[in-house]
């Protein structure tokens, strides 16, 4: 049985409507929007919800496939659009692993060798569910987004796949923050190394401008800027 057949009918209807239509963006007056952000793995909207609340000219699209978390973000601000789905390198459906630590939930499975570096944290998988996935280039095309000024990614092991899913539209993204695992053994199967991420980003015209240590030095947030993309950068 494939992932699509496991998804509830309402989820399939939502997916079909989104992929055939123009998403939720047409409900906004584009003439009043001066900045567009995309938050992938929004969790509780750290850093992006407050920005939307304080700037009516900012439009944020927040992707959060965990419905419990997504429901806490919905209807918080008219310019903060919550999309209860995941961003990946394919359009369709995928298995999503819900972790005891909700910000560790992921489309990727955990590597038991990598988990040994996280003995101080409960990282047991509570359940799994089927979620809708969409590529960034599909999303940007359907919503007719000319650019994304800021792309914030916290997708637990699949951050680089999110970037790669932008395809040719990557050149229309001005600033990207993503997370990398810098432990000797990475936590998620298939997660790229710090060097692989930097090589890919620099090869696509991005410059590393900031590094922030996370989780007792086991992860880092890397921020990249693409000067030729133009737009407004936070």
Predicted regions and their residues:
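Phosphate/nucleotide-binding beta-alpha loop and adjacent structural elements of enzyme active sites
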Residues: 1-234
């Amino acid at each position: 049985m494939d992932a699509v057949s496991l998804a509830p009918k309402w989820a399939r209807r939502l997916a079909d409507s989104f992929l055939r239509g123009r998403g939720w963006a047409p409900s906004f007056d584009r003439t009043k929007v001066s900045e567009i952000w995309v938050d992938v793995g929004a969790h509780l909207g750290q850093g992006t919800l407050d920005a939307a609340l304080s700037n009516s000219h900012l439009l944020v699209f927040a992707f959060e496939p965990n419905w419990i978390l997504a429901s806490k973000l919905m209807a918080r601000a008219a310019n903060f659009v919550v999309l209860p789905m995941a961003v990946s390198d394919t359009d369709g459906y995928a298995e999503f692993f819900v972790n005891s630590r909700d910000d560790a939930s992921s489309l990727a499975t955990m590597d038991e060798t990598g988990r040994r570096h996280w003995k101080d944290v409960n990282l047991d998988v509570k359940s799994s569910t089927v979620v809708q996935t969409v590529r960034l280039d599909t999303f940007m095309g359907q919503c007719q987004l000319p650019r994304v000024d800021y792309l914030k990614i916290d997708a637990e092991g699949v951050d680089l796949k999110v970037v790669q899913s932008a395809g040719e539209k990557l050149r229309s993204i001005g600033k990207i923050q993503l997370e990398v695992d810098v432990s000797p053994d990475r936590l998620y199967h298939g997660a790229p190394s710090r060097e692989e991420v930097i090589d890919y980003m620099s090869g696509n015209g991005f410059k590393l401008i900031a590094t922030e240590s996370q989780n007792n030095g086991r992860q880092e947030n890397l921020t990249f800027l693409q000067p030729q993309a133009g737009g407004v950068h936070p």
